[in-house]
Amino acid sequence: MPPPETMFCAQQINIPPELPDILKQFTKAAIRTQPHDLLQWSAAYFDSLSKGEPLPVKDRVELQVATQKTDSGLTPGLLKVLNKQLSSKMSVKIADLKQKWTDLCLPEEQLQNILGLDNFQDDIDWLKFLSLGCSALGGSISSALKYACEILTEDPEGGAAHIPFDTFTYIYKYLAHIDGDISEMQIEDVLNVLQSEAERQNGLIQPRNFLSSQCPLLS
């Protein structure tokens, strides 16, 4: 005969006072992020919360971008989440990147396609991976640079999306190198024009500058 179930009264059940707020914040985060696999994402969420690490949470709900073939692929919002989680280190281990990628329920094949664009070893320059991620989102170099500005900027949401000119230069030169068809002369022509713009903007550049008809073609 099985032993009787232990019964507890309300006074014996200790509910942490912060639990309702934790669950409320978790629910809001899940709604904003819309994870493809809620169980997997939830485990990553509470693991990050317990360690005091940046959470795998989007800033807001976002619509599917036109370049996505499915609703489970990389989006600007998810790339921004990865940047928050990994950008504190200039160099990131591929194993750590894969874990964060998996936590966001992103397809392994897409990660391998991005990594395959360069000869990465065990460690990755984070800004290089971010650049390639932006390229995967945008298709063209100008679109990739626009995404990079929107992800890296400290401006308010919907603002001008300024980033330091040095950061822009690094990303542009790297993507031009990966492209392979952009001459050094073309790169220098672009940077010379944009440097003049940056000098008038406290060393910052914004998408409006390189998308302007006054700027030479980026590619």
From Swiss-Prot:
Q: What is its main location?
A: other
**RIIa domain location:** 17-54
Quote the subcellular location field of this record.
Cell projection, Cilium, Flagellum; Cell projection, Cilium
SUPFAM superfamilies per UniProt: Dimerization-anchoring domain of cAMP-dependent PK regulatory subunit (SSF47391)
Q: Which InterPro entries match?
A: ROP_DD (IPR047844)
Question: Could you list the residue ranges that cross the membrane?
Answer: none
Q: What role is this protein assigned?
A: Functions as part of axonemal radial spoke complexes that play an important part in the motility of sperm and cilia. Important for male fertility. Involved in fibrous sheath integrity and sperm motility, plays a role in PKA-dependent signaling processes required for spermatozoa capacitation.
This chain's protein is named Ropporin-1-like protein
Where does this protein come from, organism-wise?
Answer: Xenopus laevis (African clawed frog)
Lineage, opening ranks:
Eukaryota, Metazoa, Chordata, Craniata, Vertebrata
Which gene is the coding source of this polypeptide chain? ropn1l
